[in-house]
Regions:
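Short secondary-structure boundary segments
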Residues: 7-8, 82, 126, 163
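Residue-level signal for inorganic ion chemistry
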Residues: 17, 48, 79, 125, ...
Length: 176
């Protein structure tokens, strides 16, 4: 089963995604993709660690190249946190896939993760509604993230958007 949970900043998407994994999975893996650049990132990482404390998650930190990730065991559920950070790493890190391959690399990574679990829950960001003009690199990031959302929504069994702490169904069940 593949579930995509999207939402804006501080919308509750991570908490909802954790709850979904906990409801569906006895053995749980948290796959962290954020690089700890600066105090703000470190604070977010600490907050997420505190959120999942005591919930039985094993943790793997992997910032890119999920297609080549090899796990030592199967899990009932994997929580991938989050797609936006993973894309930024693949696009902008020197060892990342780069603009020409980031989309395919991430889709291959999702396919790989699904081999290791019954339920994969992916957290991502809704960043498409502010109407501000950005640099070409940022516009490329936004475009690829949107394309990833479309691809993963097509593959997903369920898609939810977290709005003001409320989890709203966008898609439930396979659709053509």
């Amino acid at each position: 089963m593949l579930i995509l949970v999207t939402g804006g900043a501080a919308s509750g998407k991570s908490e909802h995604a954790e709850r979904l994994v906990c409801e569906k999975a006895q053995s749980r893996l948290y796959l962290a993709t954020m690089q700890p650049f600066g105090k703000s990132a470190e604070a977010r990482i600490a907050r997420h660690r505190a959120l999942r404390a005591g919930k039985g998650f094993a943790t793997v930190e992997r910032t890119l190249d999920l297609a080549n990730l090899r796990l030592s065991r199967q899990y009932d559920g994997i929580l991938l946190e989050d797609l936006g950070n993973l894309l930024a790493n693949e696009l902008f890190a020197p060892e990342g896939a780069g603009a020409g391959s980031a989309f395919d690399s991430i889709v291959a990574g999702v396919d790989n993760l699904q081999k290791y679990c019954e339920t994969l829950v992916i957290v991502s960001n809704e960043i498409f509604a502010d109407g501000v003009t950005y640099t070409p690199e940022t516009m490329q990031y936004i475009r690829i993230l949107g394309e990833l959302h479309q691809k993963l929504t097509g593959k997903a069994d369920a898609v939810y958007e977290s709005v003001c702490g409320i989890l709203l169904p966008v898609k439930e069940g396979k659709q053509p």
